[in-house]
Amino acid sequence: MAGAFENIVVTQDWQTQGHASFATSYPGKKVFETTKLSYGTQVLWPDHCVQGTDDASLHKDLKLPTAQLILRKGYHKAVDSYSAFEEADHKTLTGLAGYLKQRGIKTVFVTGLATDFCVAWTAMDARKLGFEVYVIEDATRAIDLNGSLAAAWKQMSAKGVKRIQSGDIASA
């Protein structure tokens, strides 16, 4: 599918040790529980994609010949990072919108993990920033935490994000 795109941006979770989104950072808390942070409610995740570990590496079979940018997310220890456009505090921008606009890109296709978190936040932020947005459903995978997948699709649809399949790429 990557061959259908002239411009590809890859996001890479790049968490710090002891990241604020990790359940292990809060004694007595469990994975998928929540806690309050300065910017709102935070879902607590298992430790994952810690900088410099194999878990944080891009998969060796990922073939993206036209990838031009790898955008690392999660390196701010106190703020989670779901969206490729802004951190979970809704204040700290990643610079991706400017990067895309400078290149004249007006349409964004979103794939990856997890549909109901990073994909959804990225897609909705892209719409908010004026991009036409498609989520390629069969190129995503959800966590579906307590109905989060259905809620994410509903929110994305309400914001004008279009839901397609990889076979629809030629007609999008």
Regions found by a protein language model. Name each.
Residues 111:
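Short beta-strand immediately N-terminal to the catalytic nucleophile in serine-hydrolase-like folds
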Residues 9-12, 132-139:
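Short internal beta-strands
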Residues 162-171:
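Short acidic-hydrophobic, aromatic-tinged amphipathic segments that line or gate anion-handling sites
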Residues 15-16, 114-118:
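Gly/Ser/Thr-rich loops at beta-strand to alpha-helix junctions
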Residues 117-130:
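Histidine-anchored nucleotide/phosphate-binding helix
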Residues 135-149:
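Short, flexible loop segments at boundaries between secondary-structure elements
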Residues 1-107:
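Active-site alpha/beta core segments
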